[in-house]
Amino acid sequence: ELLATYGEKLVGGEDETHFGRPQDVAFLPDGRILIADGLDNNRIMIMDNDMNYLGEFGSEGSGPGQTNTIHAVAAGPDGRVLVLDRSGGRVNVFRTTDDPAEFAFERSIGDLTLPLDIIVNENDFWITDLGPLRFVNFDFEGNLKYTWLVPRELPDGYIEVHTFSVDPDGNLYGGDNQYGRTQKFVPKAGSDAELLIEPPWVGN
């Protein structure tokens, strides 16, 4: 059952009720909804849990907190919000403030080629990147922890991991929009837990 529709089909815009090719959605523990209105508008729209517009942050550019193409957004611990700048090759980290319509820029992380998606965990985060195709693991200070290269030619290879997630049992799912398939990977017995991607962070 369709409950509501926001925006207008084939009608783009940059006001409070229209979008410019939005790419992703994230949910904050207090119920606010963040919409990555990113291909045309390079902004994160802030909505309450009834989808009323509260404000927005972000703009186009290469300066602090700016983006060239927002492709993903994710919420994390301690009020963090991570915004993935695909064309800018980095992740911008913001923090919530006492004002529900304001977010404070903290830092940019990564020297990436073409980042596509992000999962935030309790102490770090993972990104899929192209050139070479890989999963990249950073802590919240921006320190590189681990790089996991992804094969292309094997039967279970990828051209790009356009989106990915992990279920409560630790199984990894990766969607490839070039090969047109999603694959499931189960952790090997005895795997180092520090090198495994955890399920996305969920606030209390």
PLM features per residue range, with description:
Residues 1-204:
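Eukaryotic scaffold repeat domains enriched in small/polar residues
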